[in-house]
Amino acid sequence: GQINEETEYVLNRFGVQPPGYLSNIGTQVKDMDIRLSPEANKSMSLKNAWDLMQENSIVSLPIREKDGTLEGLITIGDIAKTYMDTTDSYLLSRARTQYQRIAETIGGKVIEGNGHGYFIQGKIMVATANPDKMKEYVEENDMIIMGNREEDHLQAIEQNVSCIIVGLGIEVTEKVLKLAHEKDIIIISSPYDTFTISRLINQSIPVKYIMKTESLVTFNTEDFTDDIQDVMIKHRHRAFPVIDKKGKCIGTISRRNFLDMHRKKVVLVDHNEKDQAVDNIDK
């Protein structure tokens, strides 16, 4: 409680600042083993996010602003769900996916055009028919996954696709490169076959397209563990972001962290009793 007049006089006499008032000494979130989160931003691809989570053995990844504040959250389950949904051929354009990210995800590189541009319109197609048949299903601004036939590449350029992806590391002819350059068509070369490319390509979309940004359940480092247990039980998440005093996200905690909390150590002096001491001294 508040210091009495005698104590205040002695402290003033010797120029000592009075100790801070402490009403509760219970275990807090900052006393838990907070799992520090690796740096992750909303522009990174799902594949990069997945790799980061695997490397750090985590199931939830906080997405942060440049100043460290929490912007969203993505889980392994979110990524797996997107990976399994392979029927949406417009996914990459709706997610405004960068060509460079696409190239990285399929282990390739941009060999023609501006890799920093974005795929914002059209669907993804695998070209398996002859050039005449392509006219029936390939539309302007589509992204086409193709093999090594020059006539197919030329037909795709004639139909004004936005991007051509060539598999198996096959070299594209100078004629194709020249025409693609004239029409601002991106060409990406990948060492993988068309089947593998079509399986991997959805992982190139940016994290921001699927991350959760609303109704996030977070805890503060100053929160008492007694207060957060019921919240954790109510929301059956695998991990919860932790925010420090400066409003920055520093990591995550889970229910398992209750097993290894670092309880505060207290020394009672002046014949003090527990029932006369600060709240939660026995916790």
Predicted segments with their positions:
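N-terminal beta-loop-helix "entrance" segment that forms/cooperates
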Residues: 2-17
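Short, glycine/polar-rich helix-capping loops at beta-to-alpha or helix-loop-helix junctions
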Residues: 4-7, 171-178, 274
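Short hydrophobic alpha-helical runs that function as membrane-insertion/retention elements
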Residues: 19-21, 61-62, 144-146, 162-168, ...
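Bateman/CBS regulatory modules and CBS-like beta-alpha motifs in cytosolic regions of diverse proteins
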Residues: 20-52, 64, 99-111, 119-150, ...
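A glycine-centered beta-loop-beta connector
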Residues: 32, 53, 61-77, 232, ...
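Short, small/polar residue-rich loop motifs at catalytic or cofactor-binding pockets
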Residues: 56-58, 234-237, 262
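A short, polar/charged loop-to-alpha-helix boundary motif
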Residues: 76-92, 257-266
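Long, charge-dense
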Residues: 89, 177, 182-212
